From Swiss-Prot:
Summary of subunit composition and partner proteins: Interacts with EP300; the interaction enhances transcriptional activity as a direct result of acetylation.
Organism lineage: Eukaryota, Metazoa, Chordata, Craniata, Vertebrata
Gene that encodes it: GATA1
Gene Ontology biological-process annotations: cell fate commitment; negative regulation of transcription by RNA polymerase II; positive regulation of transcription by RNA polymerase II
Entry-annotated residues carrying N6-acetyllysine: K151, K152, K158, K214, K218, K220
Source organism: Gallus gallus
Protein name in UniProt: Erythroid transcription factor
Localization terms from the record: Nucleus
Length: 304
């Protein structure tokens, strides 16, 4: 491998190695290298061979390697390095020491409700800190959030001093309003809604009458007349099982199915058994007259 010397001396005037380089290469102080030595002088072409060859033509191995601090860098490496005393990059300024961490959070307090913990701190128009709830309320309503929550509205049935404008009662399960907007009790309101007239005062009662809601009997099963078992036959109406009269005998069982007639069997024609057609005939077939065959009864002849 060969390198081109960027700033080397002229090809005709080789420069002797210094004393330290001569000691490293095994030469005497101030002694110049020869062509057959460990390292040849600069060739006329200006190229330097960095492969040290010994006199015998084999690769020579140095016996002592100086530390990296004592070895001077080549001349072409100095051209690539920035000048000393200048920052590594023109746009980069002086390096500041890294801080150990973010500054501790200062103690904050909401100027409206005095809260010290909130998921998000906000500011009012004057720059004071507000908690998230007070800040949102001030942003939407334009005023500070009230510190005392307003009480819930009283139920209509528990309003004190409410009197029915028709019957003058103050006890009802539900307050209604008349077409004129006056409060009326539940009874007077329903009566006017159904009849379009005011409820007469003679119908007023001191107590509140509630309706007893009964469970509808539509879902219940109706028992058949006679008190028998609901499962009865649809034909004669006589109950089946033990729910009927024990003195009556049980119905007779249904007749058993009659076997198929033999003449109908012969009129069917060929019969399929196990995937084969077996025609009826007299020649050694299924009903044939041969050995092991079946003989038709007298008076009946198989039909083909």
């Amino acid at each position: 491998m060969e390198f081109v010397a960027l700033g080397g001396p002229d090809a005709g005037s080789p420069t002797p190695f210094p004393d330290e380089a001569g000691a490293f290469l095994g030469l005497g102080g101030g002694e110049r290298t020869e062509a057959g030595g460990l390292l040849a002088s600069y060739p006329p072409s200006g190229r330097v061979s960095l492969v040290p060859w010994a006199d015998t033509g084999t690769l020579g191995t140095p016996q002592w390697v100086p530390p990296a601090t004592q070895m001077e860098p080549p001349h072409y490496l100095e051209l690539l390095q920035p000048p000393r005393g200048s920052p590594p990059h023109p746009s980069s300024g002086p390096l500041l020491p890294l801080s150990s961490g973010p500054p501790p959070c200062e103690a904050r307090e909401c100027v409206n409700c005095g809260a010290t913990a909130t998921p998000l701190w906000r500011r009012d128009g004057t720059g004071h800190y507000l908690c998230n709830a007070c800040g949102l309320y001030h942003r939407l309503n334009g005023q500070n959030r009230p510190l005392i929550r307003p009480k819930k509205r009283l139920l209509v049935s528990k309003r004190a001093g409410t009197v029915c404008s028709n019957c003058q009662t103050s006890t009802t399960t539900l307050w209604r309003r008349s077409p004129m907007g006056d409060p009326v009790c539940n009874a007077c309101g329903l009566y006017y809604k159904l009849h379009q007239v005011n409820r007469p005062l003679t119908m007023r009662k001191d107590g509140i009458q509630t309706r007893n809601r009964k469970v509808s009997s539509k879902g219940k099963k109706r028992r058949p007349p006679g008190g028998g078992n609901p499962s009865a036959t649809a034909g004669g109406g006589a109950p089946m099982g033990g729910g009927g009269d024990p003195s009556m005998p049980p119905p007779p069982p249904p007749p058993a199915a009659a076997p198929p007639q033999s003449d109908a069997l012969y009129a069917l024609g060929p019969v399929v058994l196990s995937g084969h057609f077996l025609p009826f005939g007299n020649s050694g077939g299924f009903f044939g007259g041969g050995a092991g065959g079946y003989t038709a009864p007298p008076g009946l002849s198989p039909q083909i």
